[in-house]
């Protein structure tokens, strides 16, 4: 009987799989100019998603390898023809952008086995487009192992192709202002995509994509700016100065791998260094120093894997992957690739918002901010450096600090970690809304910027991973020890000088006496002294 039941269930499962509608590849319809049909077929059953209007499907971005990016689009609840639209990309690399949808900014969230409307959704006044990027993340798939990307050039080419096809199916967004956004490793995707859009517009001689700004949350922009993890853990009190010394061989090896541009070694050493620091401090994750564990990020996966939900999303039999290890590993060569020049180019044409959660250990705020001031050079840099850094308010409380000028807005969010929209949803909605509107964040009542509170920027050349001696910032004994060493050296030198002076004086006295009292001639004096 058990065998019969098992066979029946297997056949039922197989029948269900075979009955699924194939994945909806809109590219095939676009090529035939069946754009309206493509749009109609991509409609998602709203009954499964709290009656929210949305569209989903796939765009082919590499025909030879049959590589396809999955998208899910939500027109704004308060839609108007000029409503801004936001493209959201998750980090990882290799993580699904549906994590941003369900866990952070989308119209709904999945909690306690049910969908609920999100109070602080970005989707009320902005249309939201989520793309699973790169190939392999989420529902995005390829038919070939060669379909997994290894660099940002391919990544930006794929995303640009998907955006072009998307705008053909949804032409109402073509002239609307576009903001490309994301967090963490998306700090590498977004500059690459922004430059691709800029270059394509230049090539055709018109503003084809109405890109207005880039929004990056806790972005991973350059490894050298956040290489000194041991000092970061020290500053948070997670290890002491002896702990810093204990991991110094690993820290120095990681620094050297970065300077040598040894991607494989740097990737491995970073993981080993963070694991060692976490073991020493019993820090269970690096996303938020105030939280023991980050749970429930993938709770929604069980929901979208339901047959009726997969059918509604038009994914056919494509398997969903929350985080694709292959996609992650394939991007290892990009680990140390240079991003700064792309950001500098974009700052000369677009506005950029970088927000950072204060409690993040993965991409901590302070070293990243220092690197921006020191290494980024664009034509309006002086305006940013001279701008005052001021508190900003939300709900009658200081929500963080903002510095804005020369196309760059830098915001620190108090109490948030790596996933800022999840930790501080209302505050994050406020800051992106004000940025998109081009407005200043609210300041405390009666707050006045004092000129003397913003000193001229001074470039500190003593910082960086090239320093040969690891000094522990803030160690009260490090300064004392240095003074003691200098004092000892000076005292020893002084003592030697006194001894030499006494010896030389005695020798001079003997020789002078010999000359005066023993009638030693000048030749003998010279030979004795020299």
Residue ranges and their predicted role:
Residues 2-530:
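Terminal and linker regions of secretory-pathway proteins
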């Amino acid at each position: 009987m058990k065998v019969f039941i098992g066979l029946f269930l297997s056949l039922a499962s197989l029948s269900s799989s075979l009955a699924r509608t194939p994945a909806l590849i809109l590219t095939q319809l676009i090529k035939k100019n069946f754009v309206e049909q493509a749009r109609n077929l991509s409609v998602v059953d709203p009954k499964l998603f709290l009656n929210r209007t949305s569209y989903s499907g796939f765009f082919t971005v590499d025909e030879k390898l049959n590589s396809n990016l999955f998208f899910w689009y939500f027109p704004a609840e308060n839609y108007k023809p000029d409503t801004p639209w936001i493209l959201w990309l998750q980090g990882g690399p290799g993580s699904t952008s549906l994590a941003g949808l369900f866990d952070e900014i989308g119209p709904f969230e999945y909690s306690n086995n049910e969908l609920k409307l999100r109070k602080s959704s970005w989707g009320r006044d902005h249309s939201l487009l989520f793309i699973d990027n790169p190939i392999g993340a989420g529902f995005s798939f390829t038919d070939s192992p060669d379909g997994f990307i290894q660099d940002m050039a391919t990544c930006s080419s794929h995303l640009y192709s998907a955006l072009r096809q998307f705008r053909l199916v949804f032409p109402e967004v073509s002239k609307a202002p576009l903001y490309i956004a994301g967090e963490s490793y998306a700090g590498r995707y977004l500059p690459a995509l922004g430059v691709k859009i800029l270059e394509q517009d230049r090539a055709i001689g018109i503003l084809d994509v109405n890109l207005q700004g880039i929004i990056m949350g806790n972005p991973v922009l350059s490894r050298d700016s956040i290489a000194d993890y041991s000092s970061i853990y020290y500053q948070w009190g997670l290890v002491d100065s002896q702990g810093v010394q204990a991991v110094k061989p690993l820290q120095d090896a990681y620094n050297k791998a970065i300077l040598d541009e040894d991607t494989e070694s740097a990737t491995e050493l970073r993981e080993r260094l963070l694991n060692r620091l976490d073991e020493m401090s019993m820090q269970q994750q690096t996303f938020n120093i105030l939280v023991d564990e980050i749970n429930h990020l993938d709770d929604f996966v069980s929901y979208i894997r339901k047959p009726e939900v997969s059918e509604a999303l038009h994914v056919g039999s494509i398997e969903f992957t929350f985080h694709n290890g292959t996609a992650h590993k394939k991007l290892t060569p990009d680990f140390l690739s240079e991003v700064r020049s792309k950001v500098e180019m974009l700052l000369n044409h677009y506005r950029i918002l970088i927000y950072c959660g204060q409690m993040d250990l993965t991409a901590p705020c302070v070293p990243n901010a220092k690197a921006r001031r020191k290494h980024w050079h664009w034509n309006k840099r002086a305006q940013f450096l001279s701008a005052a850094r001021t508190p900003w308010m939300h709900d009658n409380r200081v929500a963080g600090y903002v510095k804005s000028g020369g196309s760059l807005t830098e915001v620190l969010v108090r109490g948030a970690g790596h996933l800022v929209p999840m930790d501080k949803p209302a505050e994050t909605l406020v800051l992106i809304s004000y940025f998109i509107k081009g407005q200043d964040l609210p300041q405390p009542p009666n707050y006045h910027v004092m000129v003397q509170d913003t000193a001229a920027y001074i470039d500190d050349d003593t910082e960086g991973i090239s320093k040969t001696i690891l000094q522990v910032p803030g160690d009260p004994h490090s300064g004392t020890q240095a003074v003691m060493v200098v004092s000892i050296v000076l005292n020893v030198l002084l003592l030697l000088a006194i001894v030499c002076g006494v010896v030389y004086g005695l020798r001079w006295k003997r020789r002078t006496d010999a000359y005066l009292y023993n009638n030693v001639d000048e030749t003998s004096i010279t030979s004795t002294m020299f």
